């Protein structure tokens, strides 16, 4: 807690865990367009923003709930395939508006292997944006959700009750989780044909 007269309280958004002001300062100085990825407990949110003295200007954005509403995505809205699709959708919209290059802004997310943030960035790169991310290894089978399908197959044979409990949202929407990779391809083609 506060000790002595020299103690300074950190800014509110830093205390709330929303903004890293050091990184924010670097982005403002660089004046580059940011590719912002935020992962919540339910959704993936992707925004492409320009820096402006009055406040950030959103060039394009995508929310993983759009996958369900507009493109009939039947999987979870915050898993790895939906992160990829959301990044792809946002990038298509940005490319339409003339954006060609961005800088990744992952906020307070830890840049660790297998983080969904990098799958959203990979989706944007595949859609045509140039985003420098360095040496991050991205597994292509995880993009399609093959790891989820394999786990679902294994669980279905071992424990049907747990399978029904863990994949209740998939089953409620009419998708067998074992068919997730083919469903992913179908939704990706819908996004490509719609053009964002």
From Swiss-Prot:
Span of the signal peptide: none
Subunit structure: Part of the 50S ribosomal subunit. Contacts the 5S and 23S rRNAs.
Name of the protein this chain belongs to: Large ribosomal subunit protein uL18
PANTHER family reported in the protein's UniProt record: LARGE RIBOSOMAL SUBUNIT PROTEIN UL18, RIBOSOMAL PROTEIN L5-RELATED
Domain of life: Archaea
Cystine connections: none
Gene Ontology BP terms: ribosomal large subunit assembly; translation
The entry's keywords: Ribonucleoprotein, Ribosomal protein, RNA-binding, rRNA-binding
GO cellular component terms, semicolon-separated: cytosolic large ribosomal subunit
Described purpose of this protein according to its UniProt entry: This is one of the proteins that bind and probably mediate the attachment of the 5S RNA into the large ribosomal subunit, where it forms part of the central protuberance.
Gene Ontology MF: a single term: 5S rRNA binding
Any Pfam family: Ribosomal_L5e
Taxonomic placement: Archaea, Thermoproteota, Thermoprotei, Sulfolobales, Sulfolobaceae
UniProt xrefs under Gene3D superfamilies: 3.30.420.100
């Amino acid at each position: 807690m506060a000790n002595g007269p020299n103690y300074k309280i950190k800014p509110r958004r830093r205390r709330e865990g929303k903004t890293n002001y050091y990184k924010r300062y670097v982005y403002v100085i660089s004046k580059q367009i940011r590719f912002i990825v935020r992962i919540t407990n339910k959704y993936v949110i992707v925004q492409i923003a320009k820096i402006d003295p009055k406040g950030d200007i959103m060039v394009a954005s995508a929310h993983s709930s759009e996958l369900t509403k507009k493109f009939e995505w039947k999987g979870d809205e915050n898993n790895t395939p939906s992160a990829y699709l959301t990044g792809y959708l946002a990038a298509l919209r940005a490319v339409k508006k003339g954006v060609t290059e961005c800088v990744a802004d992952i906020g307070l997310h830890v840049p660790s292997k297998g983080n969904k943030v990098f799958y959203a960035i990979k989706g944007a790169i595949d859609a045509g944006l140039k985003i420098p991310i360095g040496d991050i290894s991205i597994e292509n089978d995880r993009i399609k959700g093959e790891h989820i399908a394999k786990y679902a197959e294994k669980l279905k044979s071992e424990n049907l009750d747990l399978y029904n409990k863990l994949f209740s949202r998939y089953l409620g929407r009419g998708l067998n989780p074992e068919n997730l990779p083919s469903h992913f391809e179908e939704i990706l083609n819908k996004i490509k044909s719609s053009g964002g």
